[in-house]
Amino acid sequence: MFRHAFRTFAFCLFATVFGTDVGFGQGLATPVSRLETGMLGAGRPWQTPYYINDSNVDGPTVLITGGIHGNEPAGARAAEQIRHWPIARGKLIVVPRVNRFGLDQNTRFIPNAVDEQKDLNRNFPSSEDPSRLPRGEIASALWDFVVEQDPQWVFDLHEGYEFNRSHQPKAGKEKSVGSSVIYAKNETLHELAQSMQLVVNRTVTNPNRKFVLLGRGPKLTTLANASRTVLRKNAMILETTYNFQRLPTRTRQHRTMMDVALRRLGMIEVDCVDVVVAPRTDDGDAQVVVGIYDDSGCSEGGANNIELALRDSHPTTVVRLGSRDMRPQVLDQLDVMVFGGGSGSKQAASIGKEGAEAVRSFVAAGGGYVGICGGAYLCSAYYDWSLNLVDTHVFTGSRDVEGHGPAPMWVRGETTHVEVQLTDEGRTVFADFPDRMKVKYHNGPIVSPRLFPGLTPYTPLAIYRSEQVLHPPQKGTMIDTPAIVSG
């Protein structure tokens, strides 16, 4: 368990996180379940984990698959989160990352597969051809697993590239199935699909992006269609839309729909949409749970880079979160929340006052905060939209520049590299880093003490030893100021 040693860090450039101790904090009654983990295709290069959560109480068996298409990550991430939900009845089986190599390479197809087998979701049996077998190792292994587990329900989580409701494809092109529920229409499935659509659409404000029902049934040779027609199972494909929406939004949409489905089936007894990781345990091998903000005001590429950097650190579970996730029910599951580069003011506007208060409460309860560039502006105590987590004043405002007119002082030019030096305190935190180093810089905050009521003085961990200057009034204002602080 963690949450006892975290502080707030403001980074003008880059970050690494360690640490903490407090419970799951959700008040969820977790039934006594039997948990089983194994590998689909064990020993093969493409092997991928599956998870079985058996409540030991009579109820339906449900299979959830994600990541069959590698460029559709929201389904894989949602499935990975859903596998941690507390099951009250029945058995929940989850294969989150079926096409693992495709997900790693962000490609729809199976990397290096022959052309006729590269689309994994066209490799399954068909009732129209009883002699047809699954094509390729992955489809064969997954199909054998489905047959062996014998679920009553199969939910395959996908993403389309455009919103079906508003997509207008060119002549001869197929309409995208993004933001839809695909099923073969019958009374049982239609009633459930309507309930899922109703609830998820409450979270969608743009009418052109709302979910639609496609009762025509899944395409032939897809996993869902084969499960339906060959094995006679209830099967659905849930589609979000990966263009124009950030990853946490789409992942939450999948969780929302599956929450409706599992509650209607009597498998969960409480709202689980906000459950994104496993419950806390007293296991000494517990991982640090890090939330990365990935929504308006934050660079999506920056969020990707933060996640990549964390893969090689202390055992870490990373969750990408959006503005709707800035609530106690989600944050209480984390050890650290990271806000990366972008615009601090836009991040503040996106999370809103309730989200800001949730972040403050999370930190006050012992959670960690890492602010990088835009996130460092956000956690300062300077602006009326600031979180007031660190006692930092920000060098900003406008100055008159000859031949230019008023110039904002926070703008220092294009991305460059500057030199920083660790302080004695910084060397204890960043023991694996050299004393002086070049780091990437792009208009991060130049800070000094604010003396904000209720905040303790910050501790500098690194100092700028060079500076970037765009206008004469900026000269000398960056050198020897903090590059990284903790508070």
Residue map of PLM features:
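Short glycine- and acidic-rich boundary segments immediately preceding or forming the N-terminal edge
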Residues: 13-15, 19-49
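Short beta-strand-to-loop junctions in surface cap/lid or active-site-entrance loops
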Residues: 49-58
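A glycine-rich, often tryptophan-bearing local segment used as a flexible ligand/cofactor-contacting loop or short
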Residues: 345-434
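Active-site/substrate-binding loop(s) of hydrolase catalytic cores
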Residues: 40-45, 59-61, 73-202, 206
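Catalytic beta-strand/loop cores that center a nucleophilic Ser/Cys/Thr
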Residues: 413-487
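Active-site-adjacent mobile loop/cap segments within catalytic or ligand-binding domains
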Residues: 215-277
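Helical hinge/lid and interdomain linker segments adjacent to catalytic or ligand-binding clefts
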Residues: 295-384
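Bacterial N-terminal signal peptides that target proteins for export
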Residues: 1-10
